[in-house]
Amino acid sequence: MPPAVTRETLGAWLLKANPAVWDVRRFRAEGHTRLTSWSVQRGYRTGLMRPGDRVVFWLSGPGTGDLVRGVWGLGHVVGEAEAWQDTDPGWWLDDAARQALRARVDVDVPLLDHPLPAADLRSAGITDLEVQRVPQMSNPSWVSRAQLDLLADLLPAWPDPPRAR
């Protein structure tokens, strides 16, 4: 079976957060407005991640209250995925999930002022994103170039990639 994603088909990486596992409310309440790294599952996909690749940050879960399921951030990969063990509880609500991590990737993903709800994607006819079809899949998920083109009308302007240091 060929890989689901290749460098040629990739539009953006999609990184998911489950609010039952990672405390997005507290993260925001503490004044954070951007993600600088995210946990990923080691595998062929993390081997494909490159600095400059686009990133969509997706909040999963039931989508109730102010934690609407959908797109919460847009940005870029800024470093290669690397082996990693998270020893800081940080915003984790599920310690077993935190301890199960084995890799992370550095990103620059500003959070959106107004998340784009998954329901708005469905209303626009966007129903075949991997995160919609297989929501329990581990990070990273992905969005094809064609799917990203369809999303463009619903999303705010993509931020510029950060400058190299």
Regions found by a protein language model. Give the residues of each.
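Histidine- and/or cysteine-centered catalytic micro-motif in compact active-site loops
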Residues: 18-20, 60-62, 76-80
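Short coil-to-beta transition motif at edge beta-strands of beta-rich domains
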Residues: 46-63
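Aromatic- and Lys/Arg-enriched surface recognition patch
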Residues: 68-70, 76-142
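Eukaryotic short linear interaction motifs
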Residues: 22-23, 64, 83-85
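Beta-strand-rich binding-surface signature
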Residues: 12, 54, 102
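Acidic, low-complexity intrinsically disordered regions
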Residues: 9, 18, 34, 54, ...
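Compositionally biased, charged N-terminal/linker segments
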Residues: 1-51, 128, 143-165
